[in-house]
């Protein structure tokens, strides 16, 4: 899969699960963002629970929202 230009990838940990597959994630730099699960993670039924370490993609246009693209094992 090709890397997207302009996205920011950061590590974080899931604080809480919210409705509609949305999560509150605390990034490694201390910021808290709202993040939803990427389509491929939904497709493969990857479950995300609080305290999981994840990788979040942020758009440079809105740094308060992101997309969870990977869950560490």
Curated annotation (Swiss-Prot):
Annotated Gene Ontology cellular component terms: cytosol
A Gene Ontology molecular function term of the record: rRNA binding
Keyword Heme: no
InterPro entries the record matches: NA-bd_OB-fold (IPR012340), RNA-binding_domain_S1_IF1 (IPR006196), TIF_IF1 (IPR004368)
Keywords, alphabetical: Cytoplasm, Initiation factor, Protein biosynthesis, RNA-binding, rRNA-binding
Subcellular location: Cytoplasm
Domain of life: Bacteria
Annotated ranges, domain S1-like: 1-73
Role according to the record: One of the essential components for the initiation of protein synthesis. Stabilizes the binding of IF-2 and IF-3 on the 30S subunit to which N-formylmethionyl-tRNA(fMet) subsequently binds. Helps modulate mRNA selection, yielding the 30S pre-initiation complex (PIC). Upon addition of the 50S ribosomal subunit IF-1, IF-2 and IF-3 are released leaving the mature 70S translation initiation complex.
Record's subunit section: Component of the 30S ribosomal translation pre-initiation complex which assembles on the 30S ribosome in the order IF-2 and IF-3, IF-1 and N-formylmethionyl-tRNA(fMet); mRNA recruitment can occur at any time during PIC assembly.
Family the UniProt entry places it in: Belongs to the IF-1 family.
Record's protein name: Translation initiation factor IF-1
Organism: Tropheryma whipplei (strain Twist) (Whipple's bacillus)
Gene: infA
């Amino acid at each position: 899969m090709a890397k997207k230009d302009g996205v920011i990838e950061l590590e974080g940990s899931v604080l809480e699960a919210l409705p509609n597959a949305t999560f509150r994630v605390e990034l490694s730099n201390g910021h808290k963002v709202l993040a939803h699960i990427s389509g491929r993670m939904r497709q493969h039924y990857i479950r995300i629970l609080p305290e999981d370490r994840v990788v979040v993609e942020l758009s440079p246009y809105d740094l308060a929202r992101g997309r969870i693209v990977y869950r560490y094992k």
